[in-house]
Amino acid sequence: MFSCIKGKERTFRNLINGEWINSSSDKFIDIYSPVGNCLVGKVPAMTTDEVDLAIKSAKEAQKVWRDVPVNKRAEILYKAADILIEKVEDIAEIMMREIGKDKKSAESEILRSADYIKFTADTAKNLSGE
């Protein structure tokens, strides 16, 4: 699960401009679980230039996204919600380790998030008359 972000030894990468990358800093930030203080994973410590690039890329992506018709946006959001539902157990497992949530609470939060994404997509379609 999540092989696109996870490398060996629970070392994660950042998604910038559609690509999974490591930081040129070659430094990592260790993430520990509040339960048992065990290592959950490591995330790249990004350089200032990499943070600036991530922000610039997000702004450019927003320009493209705003031109996507509402129906297409809703379709994409529904797909994202469906993926959350499909992967609820895997995501809950990560949440349990990373932030110490119990399984029931983690799964409930994921399912509520999926519902809210769908609600938001439906609201946007109704507001635009599509």
Write out the residue ranges for each language-model feature.
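Glycine-rich loop-to-alpha-helix module at the N-terminal edge of alpha/beta enzyme cores
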Residues: 38-127
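Terminal low-complexity tails and localization/encapsulation signals of metabolic enzymes
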Residues: 1-42, 75, 127-130
